[in-house]
Amino acid sequence: MNIRPLHDRVIVKRSEVESKSAGGIVLTGSAAEQSSRGEVLAVGNGRILENGNVMPLDVKVGDIVIFNEGYGVKKEKIDGEEVLILSESDLMAVVG
């Protein structure tokens, strides 16, 4: 994937979610949950501070993260794959 996020932006590919209920029923449409976890595919150079310095991001390519998909999260198709473009501040945790 050829994409380079700017500043404190992160590109995340959402993890697949089990589409069956505990009883084995296949869930579709609004009944199927979307995961709030994903793999970091690319990171920007960092957040620009008021003094002009750049603070590197805490996450790196390959990290599995839990994110808050709220206002400001952009969905895009890159090379046929749906990815999320979000700020590092939308990430809540690194798993593992």
Swiss-Prot record:
Keyword tRNA-binding: no
Any Pfam family the entry gives: Cpn10
Lineage: superkingdom: Bacteria
GO BP terms, alphabetized: chaperone cofactor-dependent protein refolding
Functional summary from the UniProt entry: Together with the chaperonin GroEL, plays an essential role in assisting protein folding. The GroEL-GroES system forms a nano-cage that allows encapsulation of the non-native substrate proteins and provides a physical environment optimized to promote and accelerate protein folding. GroES binds to the apical surface of the GroEL ring, thereby capping the opening of the GroEL channel.
Family as reported in the entry's similarity comment: Belongs to the GroES chaperonin family.
Record's protein name: Co-chaperonin GroES
Native source organism of the sequence: Shewanella halifaxensis (strain HAW-EB4)
